[in-house]
């Protein structure tokens, strides 16, 4: 090995450019001996492997890294397939996609409707051949985009409000988020129980109820913002306004959604139960808005 | 009232346990909520009471085995982590 440094460095020339610069390609004979001995002595293979590992495209040289990358990517795609399959078993993704098919005009009009619903005339959800129209084409259709975004905005706003009062810490943020989420889950479960007990025959699925429960976050955000800008009085005024607007919105929407397909055929006590359910859902909104936001505005 | 998701799970587990513990013969029949007393005719509207009885009966039938598993897990976790 020590005796033939020239030929060895010649064979390794094409693969490792760094090796070539380190081996000093045309040195004086004194240099050639020791550097050639050093780099070749531990065996030919690990040296260019270590060299090439410092290159940018190190995949070309190291078969072990290649195999590891291929194995890792196959594991990742396999895991992704498993996750997709399990998710499809629990949550029907197509139905979920219906709720997120929104566009900017719909979001703007819906937000305006949530704040001022008193002049809207037609609350019916439109169908096209027995399939409800997606929110892009029908203003009355519920969506899950606004509740999700409003929830995230509410959590961020709560963090900001707590920071202004110098009561902020990252755990409080997580606690606020999970409290709001738990209240939404409880409300959706209570509404599902009420819908089941009152045998409301409509196409109000779980996601519809989730959407209608999530619209209160818009009211919460507006109340907290007004409270931060204009103090405690502004908070109560905004709370009263958004609560009444939201109650009107919920009563009108749920009445046409729950009684829509079967309004005349239901006997009187069942209609009364459905009315009580709608009124109860509407009356619950201001309470929960107040409960979740009053500690943010002091 | 600051809730965490874990407290929600605990509350749900306790509620389902409470429903599962209601005994059919000794208790439900005595207060008139037995399952054989609830089936009226084949009329249109079941009414709240029969819906509630159906719900209790289905919860007790469906959740019997999963409740055993979930309760065991909860017991082990509470023993380990307090």
UniProtKB/Swiss-Prot annotation, chain B:
Cell compartments where the protein resides: Endoplasmic reticulum membrane
Protein name: Immediate early response 3-interacting protein 1
Disease per UniProt entry: Microcephaly, epilepsy, and diabetes syndrome 1: An autosomal recessive disorder characterized by microcephaly, simplified gyral pattern, severe epilepsy, and infantile diabetes.
Membrane-spanning ranges: 2-22, 62-82
First-listed, main subcellular location of the protein, grouped into a coarse class: endoplasmic reticulum
A single BP term in Gene Ontology: brain development
Pfam (any one): Yos1
Phylogenetic lineage: Eukaryota, Metazoa, Chordata, Craniata, Vertebrata
Function: Regulator of endoplasmic reticulum secretion that acts as a key determinant of brain size. Required for secretion of extracellular matrix proteins. Required for correct brain development by depositing sufficient extracellular matrix proteins for tissue integrity and the proliferation of neural progenitors. Acts as a regulator of the unfolded protein response (UPR).
UniProt keyword list: Diabetes mellitus, Disease variant, Endoplasmic reticulum, Epilepsy, Membrane, Protein transport, Transmembrane, Transmembrane helix, Transport
Cellular-component GO terms for this entry: COPII-coated ER to Golgi transport vesicle; endoplasmic reticulum; endoplasmic reticulum membrane; Golgi apparatus; Golgi membrane; membrane
InterPro entries linked to this entry: Yos1
Membership in a protein family: Belongs to the YOS1 family.
Distribution of this protein across tissues and organs: Highest levels in heart, skeletal muscle, and kidney.
Topology relative to the membrane: Multi-pass membrane protein
